[in-house]
A protein has these predicted regions:
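Extended intrinsically disordered, low-complexity coil regions enriched in Ser, Thr, Gly, Ala
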Residues: 58-100, 137-154, 208-211, 215-249
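Conserved small/polar residues in nucleotide/adenosyl-binding loops
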Residues: 251-257
Length: 257
């Protein structure tokens, strides 16, 4: 029988795995910082620096950036902040994975716990959960045409969705913020928080338009000795673009959650 074949390529899910790790480290307070009286607030982010696919396992390397706001006995400041980088490197066993596979890693911060050993040293314990999603390339051959007089062929057009591009990119925003007239000048920034709201993305020709709002909170030491701790808030509109050569007007976009 005479027929034509065509190769079809795709990406298929292969395996999933979750792993929980604990980062435990004692950290000294820098000489330039006042003594720690009490921890007030903590937070952190995970920076994944490397992922390596191996036979039956995956290596992940990165750091947890810890930030803390604490109270002091210093009457001129009362509040101070500190930051530490806590490195980690882990191997997770996943049966059947190969160096040619692809991995997507997500994380959740389950717990951040601090213990004050003394006024110059704190113990930091972080509990993280990593989710690994393994995919592999698929290549299959399918019959698209049969050249035979005695063979009947039924054809049907089917709409399919094709993955054009799957990548990460960074939208860089730069704004100059002016303090309200009733606020003291900034001597030292202690704590910042940035929250995004109503974030939306729209496909354009070879670009992605991003719109929304950015709420900024800053806690700082002012130059006014009578009111040393000050804060300020801003709401900034977001309207920027990311270059994406693969995108066209009929492309469907999915933002990560």
């Amino acid at each position: 029988m005479d027929f034509d074949k065509k190769e079809f390529y795709g990406i298929v899910a292969k395996a999933k795995k979750q792993m929980q790790i604990t980062i435990d480290q004692d950290c000294n307070v820098a000489d330039t910082k006042p003594d720690v009286e009490k921890m007030i607030q903590t937070r952190g982010i995970v920076k994944i620096q490397e992922t390596e696919m191996m036979v039956d396992r995956v290596r992940i390397k990165g750091e947890f950036v810890f930030q803390g706001l604490y109270g002091t006995n210093d009457t001129s400041a009362y509040l101070e902040s500190l930051e530490y980088s806590l490195p980690f490197e882990e191997y997770v066993h996943i049966e059947g994975v190969l160096p040619s596979d692809y991995v997507k890693v997500k994380y959740t911060i389950d717990d951040i716990n601090t213990i004050l050993i003394n006024s110059r040293k704190i113990s930091i314990r972080v509990l993280l959960t990593f989710s690994f999603q393994i995919t592999e390339e698929m290549k299959e051959k399918g019959i698209i045409e049969i050249h035979e007089e005695n063979v009947s062929v039924l054809k049907k057009d089917v709409q399919i969705t094709d993955l054009i591009v799957n990548k990460k990119d960074i939208a860089r925003l730069k704004e100059e913020l002016v303090l309200p007239a009733n606020k003291a000048n900034i001597y030292q920034i202690l704590w910042t928080q940035v929250d995004m709201e109503n974030l939306q993305a729209k496909i354009g020709e070879h670009m992605i338009e991003i719109q929304g709002a950015m709420h900024i909170f800053v806690l700082y030491l002012g130059e006014d000795a009578q009111m040393p701790v000050q804060y300020a808030r801003w709401e900034i509109p977001v309207d920027t673009q990311l270059e994406c050569y693969e995108s066209v007007s009929y492309t469907h976009l999915t933002l990560p959650t």
